């Protein structure tokens, strides 16, 4: 980065921090993008004059609302709901809803900002948004989750719609929660439309939607590996998380010939040197999706596995790492451990799971590193395909959706290579994804 570009980033970030104090996740996400785009922006008088990045970094609308609901003891509880409608230059706002105690405005603004670029990369007509609440569904009965979802949607419904804003699931929001919210939306609005994605197959959902983020991350990693004449076959893979993304990344990596040896949750991780095969993965899916248990129970059931409480799996020797849990879960020291252990490829299944220090280390050592906005775009791409099917009142077969998903991930990889290839031949996927995602949104904003 030259002096002019560096000065642009510092001035831009100083203004952003002044306007958005105490929002570290948002600052981190914007800085990463600004550093990638700065040389491009300072070379373009139009982008500077029209202040395109400054406009993208300011949400079009932020909605914050009260969510009162009745728990099983008959007591009133109050949570806070949010919807950040970031950018609608290329389509209706699109992005997930997250239910987790850590949810705050900074996290949702960072996610909505990232979502804008990710949705642009898919080439589908979707803007960027994100929402959620500090409600914690863990340990709650189905009845309590239903009451909360209904109260949440009672307010949210006035701000969304199939041509305005189309939410989906995220951490803490799966098929059960989407069902409760869709039912409430339908009761209040008296219409059956594709206003939410991630719906059940029998009522407007798309085949492969649950699998899409994990599968797409593997398809992207496969394309990256191919640039070095490598593949998943015979490789050892470390995956963090044990939710939707981690489960299907594990399944697809195994199908592609790799051996997945770790999964984790907020309490710790399991290491199974024999590999997590289809039968073991089925147990994990039952444990997590139905019984909502802890990953520790995997080690109790399979003697080949060992459980490490309070730790993350990045010290385990592997060829490919796929962080699929949550933001900033992989720091500089852990990145160095992966490098020292011979890891060649890191593909982010979660949103911004690697800290800036970790990314720097991966890039210094010329690892194949894919940021979440490119690698995990398969989820929102398939949400876009669900919106298309809802609009046309048809359902495609799983094979058709998989082929379209695969094609989208290959295209995203091509865009990253086009914009991210450095003079020495190294592909900087962070720069490639940021410039590729930015250009489409910027051109649309300039035209409007």
Regions found by a protein language model. Give the residues of each.
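General beta-strand structural signal in soluble alpha/beta enzymes
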Residues: 164-168, 191-196, 239, 262-265, ...
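Buried hydrophobic packing segments
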Residues: 108-111, 181, 217-225, 249, ...
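Rossmann-like adenosine-cofactor binding region
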Residues: 268-369, 374
């Amino acid at each position: 980065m030259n002096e002019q570009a560096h000065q642009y980033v510092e001035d831009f970030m100083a203004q952003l921090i002044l306007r958005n104090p105490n929002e570290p996740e948002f600052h981190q996400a914007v800085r990463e993008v600004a550093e990638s785009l700065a040389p491009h922006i300072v070379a373009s008088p139009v982008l500077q004059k029209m202040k395109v990045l400054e406009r993208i970094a300011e949400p079009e609308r932020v909605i914050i609302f009260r969510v009162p609901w009745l728990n099983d003891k008959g007591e009133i509880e109050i949570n806070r709901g949010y919807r950040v409608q970031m950018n609608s230059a290329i389509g209706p706002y699109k992005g997930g809803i997250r239910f987790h105690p850590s949810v705050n405005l900074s996290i949702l603004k960072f996610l909505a900002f990232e979502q804008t670029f990710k949705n642009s990369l898919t080439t589908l007509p979707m803007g960027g948004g994100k929402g959620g609440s500090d409600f914690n569904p863990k340990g709650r009965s189905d009845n309590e989750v239903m009451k909360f979802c209904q109260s949440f949607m009672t307010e949210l419904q006035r701000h969304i719609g199939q041509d305005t804003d189309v939410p989906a699931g995220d951490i803490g929001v799966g098929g059960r929660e989407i069902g409760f919210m869709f039912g409430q939306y339908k009761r209040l609005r008296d219409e059956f439309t594709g206003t939410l994605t991630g719906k059940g197959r029998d009522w407007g959902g798309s085949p492969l939607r649950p699998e899409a983020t994990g599968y797409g991350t593997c398809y992207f990693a496969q394309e990256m590996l191919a640039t070095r004449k490598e593949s998943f076959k015979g490789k050892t893979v470390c995956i963090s998380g044990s939710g939707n993304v981690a489960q299907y990344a594990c399944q697809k990596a195994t199908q592609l010939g790799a051996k997945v040896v770790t999964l984790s949750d907020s309490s710790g991780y399991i290491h199974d040197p024999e590999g997590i095969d289809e039968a073991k993965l089925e147990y994990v899916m039952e444990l997590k999706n139905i019984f909502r248990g802890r990953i520790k129970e995997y080690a109790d059931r399979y003697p080949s596995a060992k459980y490490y409480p309070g730790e993350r799996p990045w010290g385990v020797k592997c060829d490919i790492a796929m962080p699929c849990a949550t933001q900033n879960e992989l720091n500089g020291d852990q990145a160095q451990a992966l490098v020292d252990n011979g890891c060649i490829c890191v593909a982010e299944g979660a949103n911004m799971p690697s800290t800036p220090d970790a990314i720097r280390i991966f890039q210094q050592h010329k690892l194949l590193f894919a940021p979440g906005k490119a690698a995990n775009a398969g989820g929102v791409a398939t949400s876009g395909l669900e919106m298309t099917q809802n609009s046309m009142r048809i359902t495609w077969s799983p094979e058709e959706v998989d082929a379209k998903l695969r094609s989208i991930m290959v295209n995203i990889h091509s865009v990253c290579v086009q914009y991210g290839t450095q003079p020495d031949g190294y592909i900087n996927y962070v720069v490639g994804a940021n410039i590729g995602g930015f250009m489409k949104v910027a051109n649309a904003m300039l035209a409007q």
